[in-house]
Amino acid sequence: MAHVLFWRKFANSVKSGCVSRDLKAAGAIPGQAGGGINLPGYSRTGIRKSKTGRWRAAALIALNLFMIAHIIQWQIMGKTVSPIEPSETMYTLQNGFVNAGFIFFGLAILATLLFGRFVCGWGCHILALQDFCGWLLKKIGLHPKPFRSRLLVYVPLCAALYMFVWPVVYRIFSKPGHEPIIPKFTNHLVTTNFWATFPSVAVAIPFLFICGFVTVYFLGQKGFCTYACPYGGFFGLADKFSPGKIRVTPACNQCGHCTATCTSNVLVHAEVKQYGMVVDPGCMKCMDCVSVCPNDALYFGFGKSTLLAPKSNVIKRHYSLTWPEEIVGALVFLGSFLAVRGVYALVPFLMALGCAAVTTFLTLKTWRLLRARELSFYRFNLKSSGKLHKAGWVFVIFACAWIGLNMHCGWVRYHEFLGNVAFNKVHLPDEVALAQLDPARWLSPADRQNIIQGKEHYLAASRTGLFVNNEALPKLAWLEYLLGDAEQSVQTLGTAAARQKDESKALSLYYRGAILSRLGRYDEARATLDEALAERDDLILARQEKGEALWQLGRRDEAVSVWTDAVQRNASLVLANNELAGAQRLLGNLEQASVHEKQGDQFTPNNPFYHWVLGRRLQDLGMTELAEKHFQQAGQLSSSGTELPGQN
């Protein structure tokens, strides 16, 4: 009787295309647990191996090799095609820079509108990392389980709107009246600084590890795509309009092999039964489901889009969270994202999204672990009968370390943010502050308060931080100078310059050289300004300052040569023209002095502070006659009651 029931169950299962756990365990099916044999072309689960998997792996490997070749070509030739990265579109929308990333992103969206999300499945380096991680985990017997949330799936779309739509909206409502809504487009298809918009290698490595591996381990395959990728936000939206879908024929017997194989966490068998096609925008057209179908019932074809599919609630989706947990999870995600984004001026936007998704999972899982009597993760039993096992303690320790680091980043970011807010509220112009050694004596009460608060916040972030914020250091140095501590400011700027590169380093060196000149350390100032010009030869302000240092050292011919070079590069430089006029007058070249004086006057704004700054700088160089002229003009323009600093 038992044998009859067994084979009846087997026959019914074959008819329906499904095999029960009892039959699998009994070894009645080839390749299943408990016995049997493995048929060629089939995995141990009895599901046919995907033939497209290798083709897709080859495509993704080729993509990564192409990216490496792109970087090598740039290193060898010094210039190359701008990064083929969708994030470059931001610079097109904000500044009108037409680059390769913008063109690629536009074509990818158009392709998705027609064919669906093939670009995601076959042409994304982050997805390649996620698939590689999933493959490694399966090799050691760990099968990533999808983390399913109702609310967090909207994060990619929100991130996409923030990256690509918000800048346009902001430009429309905040642009000056003379600026067009759409910026003038310029050609930036070729670049000499390929890595300018990317994080450093030291940041890129943990970024790829978190977004390509950690997210898969905790959130399941395509975890980053599902809960963090902003480009996927637009691709998923475009997929709803696409006529290209995975579709089904009447040969389907609902075996479920397609769903079991899908690495995009799509309920393929249920959707094709209900709609005749896959409607989930998470489908990345990997084609594994088509390849493994034992009846060849699935295919890619064109027809009606998701928007035209009938509405239905038949398919019941099982989520990982209750609604209260969803709300808490959304708040945790937002808090974590704000805590880590930009902390230490290191963590980029996409990395912050990946970190926030993992933090959300760990927070909610830890909360459940503390409350539940039974809980497992992968094949590890974390807790049973209300008692934590060794694996549970390991999970709790890791989760607490991760969440604790996240909270620490939030504390540092809080001080960095408030420091930046205070810094941006200081209204004293740099030119006025550098006109004399001690600007602190004539700061407004509001400026003084903001400077003190900004310095306190930057120092608090520095004292408690694990890394140095190279962008905050120059700001701290400037606040120190404004408070009258020029010596400390010079030291801080030196520290900043030693840690910076390119334009940032050049600016720190420029300000350091300018402050050294105010301290009377002209030889050090000249050397520092030479370093700045070595980083950025086009930094005209550094040339002006270098000329002043040379003049103070008695090397007047060299000073005149430097100022002349600056004016030749930019004829509208008011200070350099006035310095040349004063120098030529002292050297007896009155005709040349008159030419430069007129040229300087042509571009001098009718602002009393501007004339006062010119007078002060010229007075320090011993060009008293020209200085007095500007002091008088400043006095005339300030007759309305504007209070100017003293001349001494």
Regions found by a protein language model. Name each.
Residues 407-498, 524:
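Membrane-interface segments at or immediately adjacent to transmembrane helices
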Residues 2-276, 291, 296-440, 450-453:
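Non-ligating segments of multi-cofactor redox enzymes
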Residues 482, 518, 552-553, 586-587, ...:
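Register position in tetratricopeptide repeats
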Residues 412, 469-471, 503-507, 540-541, ...:
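Helix-start (N-cap) detector for alpha-helical repeat units in TPR-like alpha-solenoids
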Residues 451, 458-459, 493, 529, ...:
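Hydrophobic/aromatic packing residues within the alpha-helices of TPR/SEL1-like helical repeat arrays
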